[in-house]
Amino acid sequence: MIKKILTYCAEQLNSYLSRYYHRPQGLAEVGHIGQRTGEIPNKVIVSLVNVERETAGGISNNVQTYGGSFTSSSAPFLLNLKVMFATVFEEKQYAESLSVFSKALAFIQSQQKFMVDNVKYTLTLETVSTFDFHNIWTTMGGQYYPSVVCKLTGVVIDSNEIKSSGSTAQNTEVQT
């Protein structure tokens, strides 16, 4: 599911950027930002940088009753994804990367809510301190590119596996 959501974001961003820049190979893709070897892609790279569990929706077991029986399963994971949009361009194209980065920010601002497979997701800009950005980029290989981190909410991971089942009490009287 995570791959599908990030791919959708990259495809929509690519479609948006194609209004302003005409590149047959596109300008956005899902990828790993750090430790690049070889050719620089000259694109906006959409990359997952962190996953957080959302606890506001509750984390208790899911119990369902059916007549005189019940099933119990683990609560689904409600997740927030931290997604980085980075303009990974060659050094000589830095000015162009800033132009593309500005358009990418306009895309994020205009597409804060979207749907994939009838599930609604929200994409919001995160405020990341210079210190935290330094840590992120150091972890990913040290080469900095103009970038922003967004919080993507609405991701649910649910295995739908039943942990236990049983039957409910049929007699409510207590014998002594």
Residue locations for each model-derived region?
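Acidic-leaning, charged glycine-interspersed low-complexity segments
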Residues: 99, 106-160
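A broadly used, surface-exposed interaction patch
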Residues: 55-85
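"Short basic amphipathic alpha-helical interaction patches in structured regions
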Residues: 60-65, 95-103, 119-120
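Small/polar-rich, solvent-exposed N-terminal microdomains that initiate assembly or binding
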Residues: 1-63
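Oligomerization/assembly interface segments of phage tail-like spikes and tubes
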Residues: 73-90, 102, 145-154
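Short conserved micro-motifs at the rims of enzyme active sites and ligand-binding pockets
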Residues: 57-59, 160-163
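Short, cationic low-complexity segments
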Residues: 69-76, 165-176
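Long protein-protein interaction modules used by eukaryotic assembly/scaffold proteins
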Residues: 1, 80-81, 85, 90-93, ...
